[in-house]
Amino acid sequence: MFHEASQSVMPLIRRHLPPDEKRSDSRTKCSMEHWREQFRCSSFGLEHPQPHLFTQFEWGWPKVYLCWRAVAAVYHVAVIIVTGFCDRYSWTRTEKDSVKWFIYLTNWMFFQLTLSTLADFMALGYCHLVRKDIISGGIQRMPLFLKVTWVLHNLSNTGSILVTILFWGFVHSPGKAVSNVDFITHTGNTTYVILNLCIAASPVRFLHFFQPLTVAATYSIFSA
């Protein structure tokens, strides 16, 4: 009798076990398998067997993650508008000066970061409204819109950290006062990037280094 009862219960228990693709989430980022995957040729691409990782925190909570993405998007849009007005009325003296906003690396990188947060929020909202199968882990192939957000992540994360290093290491003079705009665009940007990297489940691949390098080369050519 006990054997029959156990057989009838086991299927119910198995239904509640996570699928195989979710079990690999428990693999730590310090494991040998993780580092092997980092340097496989396939890691140059944008395919990933767990698209649901792009829709949640490290510990899950996809709905709260949507709120986080909304706050990040609103904050960065507000900041880029405010900093634009501050630049317009603080150092520009002619219409030609106002156009120069677009030639500065800081402004480009912050605009890129803002675009990334907006794309994240829209992609995640689409997943919650239309593609709930992605959030639940029901698919194992990356949709195009998540690939786009992944590229924007790579570009904005690297660009923000680079701008912070260049400003504080080579541009800013010790003892000189720092404006609110400079502090937000050269410190707040990297603070957000590091925080987001720590709490978001979105994977990072070292072999995606060529993406920000391509943008850097393009900027150098056109600003030379």
Question: What are the language-model segments listed below?
Answer:
Residues 2-224:
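Aromatic-rich, lipid-facing transmembrane alpha helices and their immediate juxtamembrane interface loops
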